[in-house]
């Protein structure tokens, strides 16, 4: 059974009908859903899964207890030595979800470095993502560095600079290009 890592920007509190339809497809295929415990998109995803009586979901959290678990699903607690509440602390669960997933469905506001980081981690593990870009009301497939660059092009200059400062965005894109052999095709 496929495992789908579904996540999104913390600022996104409501799921678009197109995202719900995509989640409906995941539910119909009885894929295992891996979801985080954050407020925002994670909680909205959990709520939608609960409303559809999904039983094949796992809530991932950093540390011993999830912040949110709407459906009382099994919990995958990820141990981390980072300070509770820090960015690195919460990133630990995202990294584990990327490792455990076969592919990702991301809901993105064209700013969130956490969601963008999830897409990158999946790519580094040779897994693709389907990213719903909220401002476009459209899905973008991200299967390689080129498609990641197309996604990044949707960000404002300020958001790109912030992402580079927070997650070393350009360094990660270059790493992906090297891993995928894109540098030899430039």
What label would you give each PLM region?
Residues 12-153, 157:
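Acidic/glycine-enriched connector segments
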Residues 1-4:
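Extreme N-terminal starter segment of soluble prokaryotic enzymes
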Residues 147-186:
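Leloir-type glycosyltransferase catalytic cores
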Residues 6-11:
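Active-site donor-nucleotide binding/catalytic segment of nucleotide-sugar enzymes
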